[in-house]
Amino acid sequence: MNNKKNHAMKRSPFYLVPLAALLTAACMTPQYNKPVAPIPANFPIAQTDSGPAAVDIGWRAFFKNPELQEVIATALANNRDLKTITLQVEEARALYDIQSADRLPSVNATASESRSRALLTTSTPINRTVYQVGVSVTAFELDLFNRVKNLSAAALAQFMATEEARRSAQILLVGEVSKSWLTERTLYEQVQLAIRTLEGRQASFDLVKKRFDAGITNALELRQSDTLVQSARVSLLALKRQHALSVNALQVLVGTQIQSSASMQSLAKQETLATIGAGLPSELLTQRPDIRAAEQRLRAMQANIAAARAAFFPRIALTAGVGTASTDLSGLFNSGQNTWSFVPSVSLPIFDAGRNKANLKVAEVRSEIAVASYEKTIQVAFREVADALAARATLNDEADAQQAVQKSQSERLVLAQARYQNGIANYLEVLDAERELFTAEQQLLQTKLLNLTNAIDLYRALGGGIQEMSK
């Protein structure tokens, strides 16, 4: 008897169905292939610094100024853009939880009372009341082809991408706040410089006017001196306007009102951690959250391809229930009142006017877009680091050279004033020296700002700004 049964199973193909389903499901699970990073093995500018990696340096260690640290902390707590993306992370997590719930059956408790009236030809109508209680599982999909699993994987990847995007937004915010704060400090110092310059030129004008009134000098020198005064006044007004705009921009980033004060530390005393190890370009793939976010989005798109492929195969759903029923409420839980139901169903796509094919095509195209976006993100990151390294190679020397220019122009003005007072040179030489000194001092402040902001750009480009304290 058993031999006949075994022989029948060997001839029957139905016992192969579960095995075929498992093999097909394995094919439905995508094999993630990480694209090759389209960047060189090394940065164009050779680096000799052996400092710690930017990701290991907390922003409180990098930005040593206590006032700047307070501004950054306030921005992280109040910035509206960061709040928005933080809420988006919570939304993505909730969507992942919703999608993951589809992988488990939903069990519901039910209770009902139904009343009916039956019309009979042989007797009077009968009124009937039925009470039912029980638990049920409604349309639970047996995920034989990993459709639900891949949709859950896609939702998880989207959640991870959103979390990485939040980290990237924080890095960007820390960098932008610090640069905006330094810009405000620079403009404040330029305003103070313009005020001192205006006062000095006004004093020179008063002296020239006295000489003019005494008949020592001519009207041309008086007008030249007055022109220099008015030029300084125009520069002062323009710088005051720029400073006010910089304060407004900083307040938007910080999310609250801040005060610009003369007691704040001057730009010359600002310090950042200069010894940041650039490392290798390949390390950017793990250091930069925007690259990790792009990779997670790519994972999500590839999981969606597998889910779209699974739509071509049958969907098996189970609906089941167990409980008790009685026409008398008091007898609902008596022996012999048990009820149950078991309703499996299979849905196989036959004709859908090309909907499933179109969905698969959309998923494949979106995956290709995600690959291009991932590669572009890597290239942009490489360029940002390379640009910051190239600038760092010359900015320190440029700042030293500009400092020497400012010193020479200051000495030139002293000599020009002495020559004019001794009658050796005309006043035009003094005016030219004053203009050149003012320009040199403004450029010195700009060079210092550029040097500091470049250090911030390198710190951000290498993934620094997530940790508050150093590891």
Residue ranges and their predicted role:
Residues 78-79, 214, 422:
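Charged, alpha-helical scaffolding/interaction elements associated with membrane systems
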Residues 218, 257, 425-426, 465:
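Short coil/turn motifs that cap or connect alpha-helices
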Residues 79, 93-96, 100-103, 173, ...:
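Sec/Tat-exported extracytoplasmic proteins
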Residues 3, 148, 157, 161-280, ...:
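Periplasmic alpha-helical coiled-coil/stalk elements that build and connect Gram-negative outer-membrane
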Residues 31, 57-58, 66-67, 71-74, ...:
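Small/polar-residue-enriched beta-strand and adjacent coil segments characteristic
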Residues 84-99, 169, 173-196, 200-205, ...:
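Amphipathic alpha-helical coiled-coil segments
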Residues 4-5, 10-77, 156, 240-286, ...:
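Terminal intrinsically disordered/low-complexity segments used for targeting and assembly
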